[in-house]
Regions:
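Membrane-embedded alpha-helical bundles of multi-pass transporters
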Residues: 177, 200, 364-365, 386, ...
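Conserved cytosolic catalytic loops of P-type ATPases
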Residues: 29-122, 212-257, 300, 389
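Cytosolic catalytic headpiece
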Residues: 43, 212-422, 426-432, 465-468, ...
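Small-residue-enriched core segments of transmembrane alpha-helices in multipass membrane transport
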Residues: 7-10, 152, 173-191, 504-515
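Actuator/coupling domain of P-type ATPases
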Residues: 1-37, 41, 55, 59-60, ...
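Helix-interface capping motifs at the ends of transmembrane segments in multi-pass membrane proteins
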Residues: 1, 149-181, 205, 479-506
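Residue-level signature of catalytic and energy-coupling elements of molecular machines
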Residues: 19, 38, 57, 72, ...
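Juxtamembrane helix-loop transition segments at the membrane interface in multi-pass membrane proteins
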Residues: 18-33, 192-211, 519-534
Length: 540
């Protein structure tokens, strides 16, 4: 009987290991294999070399059907690359000179010459794999709770078994009870689900850095979006130029504004410079250039002291600005201490933004808020278009942090969605920080708890659905796979209905249930529409 019992218990352990190995194999296979060799362009020739011999700046040839060996920029040729392994997008992306490509992705058609920018462990592919594998070892709060329960449950079990033995003197019953009172399943119920959920998300171009973030997103009550570059495409265009100084022409106003903005990396500044160049304006080099965070830029252009920025920048300098709020973004331009004109810009809503907001509401998020440095009129127009519940406008970066802290102080569980770079402080103070468009941007991947490799807003609904499904699966594992089966087993043992061998056979039940329930996460289809309330995930 003892030998049979040992065999049955080993079978149970094998089932548990099988599930874990399957999930981890899914993680290792989610991105595909990076080739070990590359075709190096060497003058007019090409030769096959090991990846380890490549250096940054080398040009490699990639042909149709090849896996791209390095991160780099296309310098010749054209083609279409399947980047699903990195971004989760199934439609191949056209590639031509100037386009970025990633190691581990597949060139479906054409041929490319790629200038190497990152090799081996420095590639986006390698960093994604490292992050996902590190996430396997992180523990969610519910798992920590299960571990604590198992710790204090053991002495209670020992006392219980001693009492039963004193009363019954039945060794067979004690062995049977030992099988059913083992807390081993408590340690299996959570990690299997966490690994499976992380693997499933990574297949869709969503990187979750650990179980703690999976659980916090599942329980989030409020989702906060940064506006620019998240809900909007982040590529504003000049819509109007207004001159208020009769001594200046429109071209001269643009010359002053673009002269300063050419040194700025802000999207609004880049839009002004692009528009000025399109109008044929000769853009001068500024001197004494300075960035005023959350306000704009200052400096000297053509010997004149120039300020380019929002109303607060000019007001702080003692320059009067009209107080009427516009439903577009307005950049004011001042020269030599007085307002000389303004430039209006508009941004476009990101495709799918409205559907994503509706999907989050349907997925149990009670409140959705938007943070922006734009004025109240612009912010409220965008919020009305998208169905956003709460708006916070005219914010500096530190103000965004304060708003999120205030929400958390009120007891809200806050997830913040931003670009992962400019919003890093706000992402850090949120319970869950989500960076969009992190593909190829290591800073964005590192800044957030969850990184979306593309700018597809539907992925936010998808990762919320995965998180909720995983959290529910853990609860099911603990309740059905552990609680119900063990309670029934202990009852049957105390009544003398079963012995050790039957108990060991029944003991396989929780392991099999946990195995089947957890692996469902590896084979589900993510639904991202507003009908996700009833069934966030469904089988293919």
């Amino acid at each position: 009987a003892g030998s049979v019992l040992m065999v049955i218990i080993l079978i149970a352990e094998f089932i548990a290991d099988l599930n874990t190995d399957r999930a981890r194999a899914s993680i290792r296979g989610l991105i595909g294999a990076v080739p070990t060799t590359a075709r190096l362009r060497d003058g007019g020739d090409e030769r096959i070399v090991p990846i380890a011999e490549l250096q940054v700046g080398d040009v490699v040839l990639v042909r149709a059907g090849d896996s791209i060996p390095v991160d780099g920029v296309v310098v010749g040729g054209d083609g279409a690359a399947d980047e699903a392994s990195v971004t989760g997008e199934s439609v191949p992306k056209d590639k031509a000179a100037g386009a970025r490509v990633f190691a581990g992705t597949m060139l479906k058609s054409g041929a490319l010459d790629v200038r190497t920018e990152a090799i081996g462990d420095d590639t986006t592919f390698a960093k994604i794999v490292a992050l996902v594998e590190d996430a396997e070892d992180s523990r969610a709060p519910v798992q920590k709770l299960a571990d604590k329960v198992a710790t204090w449950l053991i002495p209670l079990i020992i006392v219980f078994l001693v009492v039963v033995f004193i009363v019954t003197r039945d060794v067979s019953m004690i062995v049977t009870l030992m099988i059913f009172t083992s807390p081993a399943e408590l340690a299996l119920a959570t990690p299997m689900v966490i690994i499976a959920a992380i693997a499933r998300a990574a297949r869709s171009g969503i990187l979750i850095k650990g179980g703690i973030y999976l659980e916090s997103l599942a329980r989030a009550t409020t989702v906060v979006f940064d506006k620019t570059g998240t809900l909007t495409v982040g590529s504003p265009k000049v819509s109007a130029v207004r001159v208020v100084d009769g001594q200046l022409s429109e071209a001269e106003l643009l010359r002053l504004a673009a002269g300063l903005d050419r040194r700025s990396s802000h999207p609004l500044a880049e839009a002004v410079v692009e528009y000025a160049r399109a109008q044929g304006v000769d853009i001068p080099e500024p001197t004494d250039f300075e960035v005023v965070p959350g306000r704009g830029v200052t400096g000297t252009v053509d010997g004149r002291a120039v300020l380019v920025g929002n109303a607060a920048l000019l007001t702080d300098a003692g320059i009067a600005v009209p107080t009427a709020e516009e439903a577009t973004t307005v950049i004011h331009v001042a020269a030599d201490g007085r307002l000389v004109g303004s430039i209006e810009l508009e941004d476009q809503l990101r495709p799918g933004a409205k559907e994503a907001i509706a999907g989050l509401h349907a997925n149990g998020v009670r409140r959705i808020a938007m943070l922006t440095g734009d004025n109240e009129a612009i912010a409220r127009r965008v919020a009305a278009d998208l169905g956003i519940d709460e708006v916070h406008a005219d914010l500096l970066p530190q103000d965004k942090v304060a708003v999120i802290k205030e929400m958390r102080d009120r007891g809200e569980r806050v997830a913040m969605v931003g670009d992962g770079i400019n919003d890093a402080p706000a992402l850090a103070v949120a319970e869950t920080g989500i960076a969009m468009g992190a593909g190829g941007t290591q800073a964005a991947i590192e800044a957030a708890d969850i990184a979306l490799m593309t700018d597809d807003l539907s992925k936010i609904v998808g990762v919320r659905a995965i998180a909720r499904r995983a959290y529910r699966t853990i609860q099911e594992n603990l309740f059905v796979g552990v609680g119900v089966v063990h309670i029934l087993g202990i009852t049957a043992a105390l009544l003398g209905w079963i012995g050790p061998i039957q108990a060991a056979l029944i003991h396989l039940g929780p392991d099999i249930l946990v195995f089947l329930n957890s692996t469902k996460l590896l084979t589900v289809r993510i639904k991202t529409g507003p009908d996700t309330t009833l069934q966030p995930l469904e089988r293919n």
